[in-house]
Amino acid sequence: MANEKTQSDLNEKLIAVNRVSKTVKGGRIFSFTALTVVGDGNGRIGFGYGKAREVPAAIQKSMEKARRNMVTVALNEGTLHHAVKGRHTGSKVYMQPASEGTGIIAGGAMRAVLEVAGIRNVLAKAYGSTNPINVVRATIAGLSGMNSPEMIAAKRGLSVKEILG
């Protein structure tokens, strides 16, 4: 029961709905795909990709997959700890922290991921392929690779002061 409660306060965003077809002997069979992201606004994000014969069913499937596929990202007061790069297949993304009041300067699929993650100030750019699925995967990969100064200090056996200089 506790699991149901935590899932109800997640932000959900639909990124893309696409009609796809399968060609069979009798003609084409159309179905729909949906790409969604979910997040708690506090560093937990997940994405899902669902496919069904009807749009609502595809969206529902992708939301369920997104809730099952969540990762935690270390945030620094609504922005990133440091500049990060992420890549997935042909998509490359670059994200850097921004000062308070900057907002989310990012395009398309990347903006949705950053919004549901709870990042409020960031400068971001997508290079190469802008296929939404690949951009979402690259963004999540980049955010997952980000470490807080505390995490780096613990790994190196140093104090946070020594890490930050």
Curated annotation (Swiss-Prot):
One of its GO terms (cellular component) is small ribosomal subunit. It comes from the Bacteria. Keywords: Ribonucleoprotein, Ribosomal protein, RNA-binding, rRNA-binding. GO terms for molecular function: rRNA binding; structural constituent of ribosome. PROSITE patterns: RIBOSOMAL_S5, S5_DSRBD. Disulfide bonds: none annotated. Residues 10-73 form the S5 DRBM domain. Part of the 30S ribosomal subunit. Contacts proteins S4 and S8. NCBIfam families: rpsE_bact (TIGR01021). With S4 and S12 plays an important role in translational accuracy. PANTHER family: MITOCHONDRIAL RIBOSOMAL PROTEIN S5. This is Small ribosomal subunit protein uS5.
